[in-house]
């Protein structure tokens, strides 16, 4: 058998191809391409959404613009409808041959810059006289009423007077009066005819001349016009206004003090009118026409004034509240104009006219017939119509004017007091003066029952000359401190001290904070809740950050508290008595006698051997007796079946002041008997004694007291 041929050698393995790496790269590229496509798709969707939102925004803008135009058109239509319902017409009365005033000729443009009154007052009065003369000449034939405005002038420079339809609707009586006047003019002189024609021409402007006051009364606004000073006076508030041509509104000029204040009856009537205004706001227009008609029947003489300030009389109803309170007789008024004062006899004349009207009312105070309209009814209806006119903007403007007219109130907050609650609020108004004192029967506004407060300590009232609240100390015993300064001397009635916002007044031990705000405005410092919350926070901080007391200070505090307790129970004059009961002669100590006669046995003997894990418990042991009664026998384990532990628990010693697990415990046998410090000292003393006195022998220990060690038995 031939030998087998050797097998050919194995070929080396082929080299690894780079295909797997290319495949991985291709997969990564495909994955990135897919992500890129998804990102592009998301970008396209976002662009579509953006275009869609832009279209929606454009549509919304166009819709809003259309709605704005529609609202403007509807508002114009509504305004025209209201004008038609009110039957008002625009009438422009030309009373001058020359061009109207320009802004540069306006009197009040340089009013506050000049020290004295400008010379234009006389020029304006001359122009008014010329205007009246031209109106008289034109009224000889017929009254020329032009409906076209002056050419080439601004709308604000034209003198417009809105004539309400009620001048013609209820004009039966004035028409008959004019007819009688025309018949009487035929036989009268030329001067009387010219005067009557002038009055008839000016009557259409809404002004009537009051002979008693020498001023012109406007029925549309309720103001008196002073032609000399070119000011408008509101008798209900005592404010002088001037007409601003640029804004077309009445601007505040000055104010006079009205004394006395309105009575309670007038306040009640105002409240009733405000209630009517809230209940029936829709009937304002009808009431306005009705009451204006009733007022126009009482107009008896008119003068025409052709100045640009009379342009917006009807709009003034929305700027200031009109009330027929000019029947009250205020004092004589001086109007301040840039340093000089212009005396105006307005209030004297008004008082004379009111007295004349009151006499007339008393004369005709008879029982009215059915359907007859009295003067009081017309005045009340006119006042109700004026107060009921306007909208929310008018009410806001009235509130602002009232806030400016009436002085603010004082909100008094108790900051610190031993008798009053901290954070209490007291309100002081300008109507009645406020008093501060201790007496209970005097009905003080702010009563402080302290010893350091006088019966009538101080008074606070509103000074109309200074236009501020003042504090007057009534000669108190301890005086008054304002802002930490003793400005009010004790026992002397001092001069009035002007109070300002934020002043702190200390009366006795009570500290008061005065807050003065216009209207109903408040701050955090005059709100009782805010003040008490801050005080509570301060108390908490003080309790947490209290100072640490030393040993001596604590002892002083203890003695102080002990004295308080003695004073509380009436023991401040008695000393401390120890065993007061035993010292009582009637007390018998029976327990002491029994101890002396019978004595007492200790259940625990001091010579008992201590327990040990190496010695057996004796039969007299209480624990062993208890176990035997329960069924335990010597040599058995514990438990019901006797399978419990038989050996005692080993004693383990640990280091002092060390917790469990800190170190390895040691048994009792490994620890030597350590002698305490006292025994060591005695041993040292014995050694010294034996060295000094060797002939004496130390006493041996008592053989009965042997230490218990391992292996010892009883």
From Swiss-Prot:
Record domain G-patch: where: 619-665
Composition bias, Acidic residues: 364-383
PTM sites of type Phosphoserine: 7, 11, 344
Classification via Pfam families: FHA, G-patch, OCRE
Any Gene Ontology biological process: vasculogenesis
Residues covered by the FHA domain: 434-487
Residues the record lists as N-acetylalanine modifications: 2
Main location: cytoplasm
Biased composition (Basic and acidic residues): 279-298, 586-609, 680-690
GO cellular component: cytoplasm; extracellular region; perinuclear region of cytoplasm
CDD domains cross-referenced by the UniProt entry: FHA_AGGF1 (cd22686), OCRE_VG5Q (cd16164)
SMART domains in the cross-refs: FHA, G_patch
Region Disordered: start-end pairs: 1-22, 259-307, 322-384, 586-617, 655-714
Modified residues (N6-acetyllysine): 664
Function statement: Promotes angiogenesis and the proliferation of endothelial cells. Able to bind to endothelial cells and promote cell proliferation, suggesting that it may act in an autocrine fashion.
Subunit note: Interacts with the secreted angiogenic factor TNFSF12.
Protein name (record): Angiogenic factor with G patch and FHA domains 1
Native organism: Homo sapiens
């Amino acid at each position: 058998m031939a030998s087998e041929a050797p097998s050919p050698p194995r070929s080396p393995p082929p080299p690894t191809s780079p295909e797997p790496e290319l495949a991985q790269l291709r997969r990564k590229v495909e994955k990135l391409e897919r992500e890129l496509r998804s990102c592009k798709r998301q970008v396209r969707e976002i662009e579509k959404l953006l275009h869609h939102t832009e279209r929606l925004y454009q549509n919304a803008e166009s819709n809003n613009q259309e709605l704005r135009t529609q609202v403007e058109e509807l508002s114009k239509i509504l305004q025209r409808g209201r004008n038609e319902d009110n039957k008002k017409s625009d009438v422009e009365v030309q009373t001058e041959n020359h061009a109207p005033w320009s802004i540069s000729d306006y009197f009040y443009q340089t009013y506050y810059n000049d020290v004295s009154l400008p010379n234009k007052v006389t020029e304006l009065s001359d122009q008014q006289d010329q205007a009246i003369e031209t109106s008289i000449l034109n009224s000889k034939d017929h009254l020329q009423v032009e409906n076209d405005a002056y050419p080439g002038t601004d709308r604000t420079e034209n003198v417009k007077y809105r004539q309400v339809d009620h001048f013609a609707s209820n004009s039966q009586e004035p028409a008959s009066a004019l007819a009688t006047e025309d018949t009487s003019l035929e036989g009268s002189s030329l001067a009387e005819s010219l005067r009557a024609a002038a009055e008839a021409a000016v009557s259409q402007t809404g002004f009537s001349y009051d002979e008693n006051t020498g001023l012109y009364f406007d029925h549309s606004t309720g103001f008196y016009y002073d032609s000399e000073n070119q000011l408008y006076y509101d008798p209900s508030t005592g404010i002088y206004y001037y007409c601003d041509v640029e804004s077309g509104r009445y601007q505040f000029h000055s104010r006079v003090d009205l004394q006395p204040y309105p009575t309670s009856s007038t306040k009640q009537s105002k409240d009733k009118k405000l209630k009517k205004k809230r209940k029936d706001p829709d009937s304002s227009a009808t009431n306005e026409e009705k009451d204006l008609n009733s007022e126009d029947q009482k107009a008896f003489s008119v003068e025409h004034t052709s100045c640009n300030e009379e342009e917006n009389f009807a709009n003034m109803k929305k700027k200031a509240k009109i009330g027929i309170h000019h029947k009250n007789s205020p004092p004589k008024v001086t109007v301040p104009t840039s340093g000089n004062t212009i005396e105006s006899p307005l209030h004297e004349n008004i008082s004379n006219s009111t007295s004349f009207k009151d006499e007339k009312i008393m004369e005709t105070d008879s029982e009215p017939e059915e359907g007859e309209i009295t003067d009081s009814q017309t005045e009340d209806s006119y006042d109700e119509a004026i107060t009921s006119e306007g909208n929310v903007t008018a009410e806001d403007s009235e509130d602002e004017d009232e806030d400016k007219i009436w002085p603010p109130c004082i909100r008094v907050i108790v900051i610190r007091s031993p008798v009053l609650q901290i954070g209490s609020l007291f309100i002081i108004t300008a109507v009645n003066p406020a008093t501060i004192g201790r007496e209970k029967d005097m009905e003080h506004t702010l009563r402080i029952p302290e010893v350091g407060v006088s019966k009538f300590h101080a008074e606070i009232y509103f000074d109309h000359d200074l236009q501020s609240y003042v504090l007057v100390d009534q000669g108190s015993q301890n005086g008054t401190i304002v802002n930490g300064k003793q400005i009010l001397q004790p026992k002397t009635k001092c001069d009035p001290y002007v109070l300002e916002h934020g002043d702190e007044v200390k009366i006795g031990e009570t500290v008061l904070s005065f807050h003065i705000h216009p209207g109903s405005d408040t701050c955090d410092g005059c709100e009782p809740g805010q003040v008490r919350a801050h005080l509570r926070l301060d108390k908490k901080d003080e309790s947490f950050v209290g100072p640490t007391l030393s040993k001596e200070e604590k002892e002083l505090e203890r003695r102080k508290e002990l004295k308080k307790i003695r004073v509380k129970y009436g023991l401040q004059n008695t000393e401390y008595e120890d065993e007061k009961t035993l010292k009582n002669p009637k007390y018998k100590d029976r327990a002491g006698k029994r101890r002396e006669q019978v004595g007492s046995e200790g259940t625990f003997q001091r010579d008992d051997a201590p327990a040990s894990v190496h010695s057996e418990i004796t039969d007299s042991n209480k624990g062993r007796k208890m176990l035997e009664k329960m069924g335990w026998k010597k040599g058995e384990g514990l438990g019901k079946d006797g399978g419990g532990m038989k050996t005692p628990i080993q004693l383990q010693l640990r280091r002092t002041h060390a917790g469990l697990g800190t170190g390895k415990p040691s048994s009792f046998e490994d620890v030597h008997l350590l002698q305490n410090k006292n025994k060591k000292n005695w041993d040292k003393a014995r050694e010294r004694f034996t060295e000094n006195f060797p002939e004496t022998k130390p006493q041996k220990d008592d053989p009965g007291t042997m230490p218990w060690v391992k292996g010892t038995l009883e």
